């Protein structure tokens, strides 16, 4: 990261949004290693989810990143935190022109786009407690899934 980026409010090259149970010890660890070797500063929240609200520091990290990389995995939508991160990422894409890159890791992009399979199940389960947030999450999932990205089945 160069000094110009720091002056312009950018603190991280990449913010990575992921569901830890699906990706932390495999795909994500390999990705982080490769990014470090290329001296790319990636913000990865390693703390376990706790509480109802995402921390202000995490929301700030999203806003202060040049790129957001969303790793959509089978259980991504089961996490309220992941969905709230996604909403913030989409807002940054629209307002700050942040670059957003979706990666579909062991999940089909159409399941994310149309909220089928595990995505549909997760949103149905969330509807019981977060009825007012589910339409916002659905919209963010659809918008992100329509972006150009990478599908892991293309690289196996």
Task: Annotate each language-model stretch with its function.
Residues 1-67:
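Conserved N-terminal substructure of TIR/SEFIR domains
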């Amino acid at each position: 990261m160069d000094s110009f980026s720091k002056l312009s409010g950018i603190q991280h090259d990449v913010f990575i949004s992921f569901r830890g149970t699906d990706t932390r010890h495999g795909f994500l660890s390999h990705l982080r290693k490769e990014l470090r070797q290329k001296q790319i500063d990636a913000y990865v929240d390693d703390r376990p989810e706790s509480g109802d609200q995402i921390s202000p520091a995490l929301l700030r990290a999203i806003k202060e990143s040049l790129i957001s990389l969303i790793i959509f995995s089978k259980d991504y939508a089961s996490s309220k935190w992941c969905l709230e991160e996604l909403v913030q990422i989409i807002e940054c894409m629209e307002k700050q022109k942040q670059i957003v890159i979706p990666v579909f890791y062991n999940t089909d992009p159409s399941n994310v786009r149309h909220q089928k399979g595990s995505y549909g199940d997760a949103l149905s389960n969330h509807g019981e407690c977060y009825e007012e947030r589910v339409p916002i999450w659905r919209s963010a999932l659809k918008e992100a899934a329509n972006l150009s990205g990478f599908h892991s089945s293309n690289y196996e």
